[in-house]
UniProtKB/Swiss-Prot annotation:
InterPro entries assigned to the protein according to its UniProt record, in alphabetical order: DUF1508, UPF0339_domain, YegP-like_sf
Keyword annotations: Repeat
PANTHER family assigned: PTHR40606, UPF0339 PROTEIN YEGP
Lineage: Bacteria, Pseudomonadati, Pseudomonadota, Gammaproteobacteria, Pseudomonadales
Source organism: Stutzerimonas stutzeri (Pseudomonas stutzeri)
Signal peptide: none
Family from the record: Belongs to the UPF0339 family. Duplicated subfamily.
Disulfide bond residue pairs: none
Keyword Repeat: yes
Gene3D superfamilies: 2.30.29.80
Sequence repeats: from-to residues: 10-58, 61-109
The name this protein goes by in its record: UPF0339 protein in ptx operon 5'region
Pfam family for this entry, one: DUF1508
Length: 111
């Protein structure tokens, strides 16, 4: 399975990416980058680190919300998930990133 990394400019003029699964659902989102090359480096870091389970920081935020961060080898967060209603659904989200990120294509979108 491969997903799609969408590169876009946010309202503040920063470059961001989101990883979408085959069904079109966003499964990982980035922080803002000042330039496109930094954003593309972030995409490459996600592709490289996604298969490694040790790179995932599993978190529980209040009110039974679960999420995860994907970290690079330098411990920097390179992607953040949405909030999930259960630990099991969060773990499925991690598996989805592992399956979709390594071979995902990169496209630029308008927003």
């Amino acid at each position: 399975m491969s997903g799609t990394f969408e590169i876009y400019n946010d309202k503040a003029g920063e470059f961001r990416f989101r990883l979408k699964a085959n069904n079109g659902q966003a499964i990982l989102a980035s922080e803002g980058y000042k330039d496109k090359s930094g954003c593309l480096n972030g995409v490459e870091s996600v592709k490289k680190n996604a298969p490694d389970d040790a790179r995932y920081e599993r978190k529980a935020s209040g009110a039974d919300k679960f999420m995860f961060n994907l970290k690079a080898g330098n411990h920097q967060v390179v992607g953040t998930s949405q909030s999930y209603a259960s630990e099991a659904s969060r773990d499925k989200g991690i598996e989805s990133v592992k399956n979709h990120a390594p071979d995902a294509k990169v496209v630029e979108v308008g927003n």
